[in-house]
Amino acid sequence: MKAYLDLMRHVLDNGTDKSDRTGTGTLSVFGYQMRFDLGKGFPLLTTKKLHLRSIIHELLWFLKGDTNIKYLKDNNVSIWDDEWADENGDLGPVYGYQWRSWPAPDGRHIDQIANVVEQIKKNPDSRRLIVSAWNPALVDEMALPPCHALFQFYVADGNLSCQLYQRSADIFLGVPFNIASYALLTMMMAQVCGLEAGEFVHTFGDAHLYRNHFEQAALQLEREPRALPVMKINPEVKDLFAFKFEDFELEGYDPHPHIKAVVSV
């Protein structure tokens, strides 16, 4: 995961001081890209321990089209805890709703994920293999507008690759989760479409380090990356919406210890 440490170092060396919505303050750069070859291991950060259980459950929650935190809380996942949700646990029309039930002007609801699976199978050379979570008409109704806003798939030589555009990226806390989540989604999509996983390409708009994460970032940069783990996925699952938590097994994960940091809200 040298690419991730390079991003962190680049922002510390070249970032611009910016104010932000949370009042914390950041060092920020605009426009940056990382690439991960999924054939060389699962890109789960090794310079600090990550909670893979949360990453998997959140992705399954997105794919269900769910926007209530009950499923997450039932599975001890606190990514979208009560400070984001209303009194009923609802987050508004966030990721899952846009992915699975994008509202069209004529009253239809478009399942972008199902559509893109169908198109990958039927027309793999299409340049329209895109899913968007950024719906300008509904942004103000969301607990948090989508940070990972749009992703596109690409098929070449039997390999499926994915590029994510992330408009806003909390480098220390959020980005490691985003890398693992979209890498896993790419692997799942590849399996159900009869392809191999290719690359995950991570493109950023505003990539930033919060000021209250500088010490943690410095500690992480002192650590040497270790060998990437391997993600095993149940090969019997051929329906993207049939995956369960038990269908995933991580092998060979040997990270450095966890580093605590405060989320800026």
UniProtKB/Swiss-Prot annotation:
Pfam families: Thymidylat_synt. The active site is at C147 (nucleophile). InterPro entries: Thymidate_synth/dCMP_Mease, Thymidate_synth/dCMP_Mease_dom, Thymidate_synth/dCMP_Mease_sf, Thymidylate_synthase, Thymidylate_synthase_AS. Its EC number is 2.1.1.45. It comes from the Bacteria. One of its GO terms (biological process) is dTMP biosynthetic process. GO terms for cellular component: cytosol. It is found in: Cytoplasm. NCBIfam families: PRK01827.1-3, PRK01827.1-5, thym_sym. Belongs to the thymidylate synthase family. Bacterial-type ThyA subfamily. This is Thymidylate synthase. The gene is thyA.
